[in-house]
């Protein structure tokens, strides 16, 4: 039996603003920067169990860790899928704390908010209704409202991933956003058919499904995470003074890692390797063996999405067979 009512309709007037932004300072948006990432060993016991989505299994949760540029869908406390994301600019950072997803909306309209960045724009005006058919609409094919104007919506492209790119929203690649939405539809058994979803993808007609009850969304700002026995040092993208020697020692100690033999200079170098779009990772075992630097590596915060082969590349491959 279906648990939620569904309506397919045009909603140009009822749809809310994209990204809470205004002219408030960045500091006012950070509510709880001390909360641990949901992927931390302190919360998972050192192991994250994965699962395929269970249709009709209503226990859903979404978590975001901003410095890791990661969004994870959980069901019954198990990881269903993790998606790379882009987040808010320094001047318009994403809200840190608890939100709730209220709807899934395909082909949303956009109402520019009353904010400095809209006032400076020559293309749009605050309060103007910009339909899904309008090329000025930045939301793409789908959005998931989180309350107070904060959204999860479509990214412009791969270049958004791992970047500070929005006015307070979470940006996700279209294919990933479709995947997330369809998993939510299946788990909640929403009254929307595959045929309706396909039609929404192919057209600009607005389609919406209410989430009742709403899905909890937890957004954290955790730059120092021990996950599955490996330390991840993520860049302090909002310059919150999180990546300090004192904080790193405290993180290691709280995970049962002996840090007394680590010199401040070593910790400083480790922290310095996490910058721009790079993270530094090293196993706890290597840290305890005195290989905190030489046993670690600097890698991209977000792995690049696989590139599509060009037509010429496909021809070359066929002729080489």
Language-model features, listed with the residues they occupy:
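N-terminal pre-domains immediately preceding structured catalytic cores
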Residues: 2-5, 15, 22-321
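Sec-dependent N-terminal signal peptides
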Residues: 10-17
């Amino acid at each position: 039996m279906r648990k939620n009512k569904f309506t397919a309709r045009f909603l140009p007037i009822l749809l809310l603003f994209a990204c809470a932004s205004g002219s408030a300072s960045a500091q006012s948006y950070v509510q709880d920067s001390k909360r641990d990432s949901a992927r931390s060993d302190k919360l998972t016991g050192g192991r994250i169990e994965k699962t395929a989505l269970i249709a009709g299994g209503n226990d859903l949760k979404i978590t975001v860790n901003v410095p890791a540029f990661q969004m994870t869908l959980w069901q019954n406390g198990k990881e269903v899928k993790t998606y790379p994301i882009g987040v808010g600019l320094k001047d318009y950072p994403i809200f840190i704390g608890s939100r709730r997803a209220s709807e899934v909306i395909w082909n949303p309209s956009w109402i520019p908010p009353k904010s400095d960045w809209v006032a400076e724009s020559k293309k749009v005006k605050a309060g103007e209704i910009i339909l899904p058919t309008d090329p000025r609409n930045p939301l793409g094919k789908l959005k998931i409202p989180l309350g107070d104007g904060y959204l999860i919506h479509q990214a412009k492209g791969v270049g958004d991933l791992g970047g500070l790119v929005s006015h307070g929203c979470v940006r996700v690649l279209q294919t990933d956003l479709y995947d997330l939405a369809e998993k939510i539809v299946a788990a909640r058994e929403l009254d929307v058919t595959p045929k309706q979803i396909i039609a929404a993808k192919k057209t600009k007609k607005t389609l919406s499904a209410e989430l009742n009850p709403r899905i909890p969304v937890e957004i954290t700002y955790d730059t120092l995470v021990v996950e599955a026995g490996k330390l991840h040092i993520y860049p302090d993208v909002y310059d919150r003074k999180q990546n300090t020697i004192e904080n790193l020692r405290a993180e290691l100690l709280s995970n049962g890692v002996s840090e007394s033999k680590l010199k401040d200079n070593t910790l400083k170098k480790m922290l310095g390797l996490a910058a721009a779009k790079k993270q530094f990772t090293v196993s706890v075992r290597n840290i305890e063996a005195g290989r905190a630097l030489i046993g670690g590596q600097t890698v991209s915060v977000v792995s690049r999405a696989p590139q599509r082969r060009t037509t010429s590349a496909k021809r070359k491959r066929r002729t080489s067979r």
